[in-house]
Amino acid sequence: MTNNKLILAIETSCDETSVSVIKNGTELLSNTVLSQIDSHKRFGGVVPEVASRHHVEGITATIDESLVSAKVKMEDIDAIAVTQGPGLIGALLIGINAAKALAFAYDKPIIPVHHIAGHIYANHLEQPLTFPLMSLIVSGGHTELVYMKNHLDFEVIGETRDDAVGEAYDKVARTINLPYPGGPHIDRLAAKGKDVYDFPRVWLEKDSYDFSFSGLKSAVINKLHNLRQKNIEIVAEDVATSFQNSVVEVLTYKAIHACKTYNVNRLIVAGGVASNKGLRNALSEACKKEGIHLTIPSPVLCTDNAAMIGAAGYYLYQAGLRGDLALNGQNNIDIETFSV
């Protein structure tokens, strides 16, 4: 008799079809990711209908591949975790319907998982979470600060009021003719450029932990437009450096300030933008100076993947959370509703 629990996790919230098998919330047995980046590049961003069609085409094979990689069968699985939201509703439904079909066919419980909770728990796959902690979520669709006193205890203390940081990266990248996704390209150029443009830092109200990147995005676009009107040469590396420094300074300051205010000495970072080298370096230096323990997952666990959904799903399963065959996707759902 064993107490080991195997979670089959499914993630289809945006443009990655991913399936993973996780043992006891920490041991990664498989993590299969089918990326759609090449399909969306020509459009300069994710096209929801195209994403949904790719999920339909790839979900069955991805499930099969993940089970084979983990060397388990569906009969061995204890529960099926699936991203309920937030995300593209059509994309979410592909994963949810696959999870419901498996749950019905094999009589397995369904565990609905919040996408951002998954990003947070990606850290747990490499280093056990210790509490209390502050989590900085930085991705294409989200920029948030989440305070946690314990497992599955989510308190959002700050969030973006307009553009998410990853969205701002992609839009600025487009203005200097960089391909999608723009974040990695800006990060690469920023390492070679100079901070010559005085782009704004948006702090909002005193002691606010919210973020705003639409003003910065507009400032960059307007600056480039004016330079082109005057036939002044634009150095893409300098634009990237100046833009990224503005973003990183705000993210770092607010994350450190939140840790101090809430008296926590552990900061974790989650989401696709967490793989940004400029941000990782700035946070590392600031946390070292302030005596804060910093955890950032490996780049492969920063982007969307099912392993993170399985890690969070394991704790939701242990806490008794269950979905049913009426489970539906939600394109906008509060992470605090998943607190237990």
UniProtKB/Swiss-Prot annotation:
Gene that produces this protein: tsaD
Protein known as: tRNA N6-adenosine threonylcarbamoyltransferase
Cofactor needs: Fe(2+)
Amino acids binding Fe cation: 115, 119, 304
EC annotation from Swiss-Prot or TrEMBL: 2.3.1.234
Organism: Staphylococcus epidermidis (strain ATCC 35984 / DSM 28319 / BCRC 17069 / CCUG 31568 / BM 3577 / RP62A)
Location(s), subcellular: Cytoplasm
Primary location: cytoplasm
One GO term of the biological process aspect: tRNA threonylcarbamoyladenosine modification
Top class in the EC scheme: transferase
CDD domains per UniProt: ASKHA_NBD_TsaD_bac
NCBIfam families: gcp_kae1, T6A_TsaD_YgjD
One GO CC term, this protein: cytoplasm
Catalyzed reactions: L-threonylcarbamoyladenylate + adenosine(37) in tRNA = N(6)-L-threonylcarbamoyladenosine(37) in tRNA + AMP + H(+)
Alphabetized HAMAP family for the sequence: TsaD
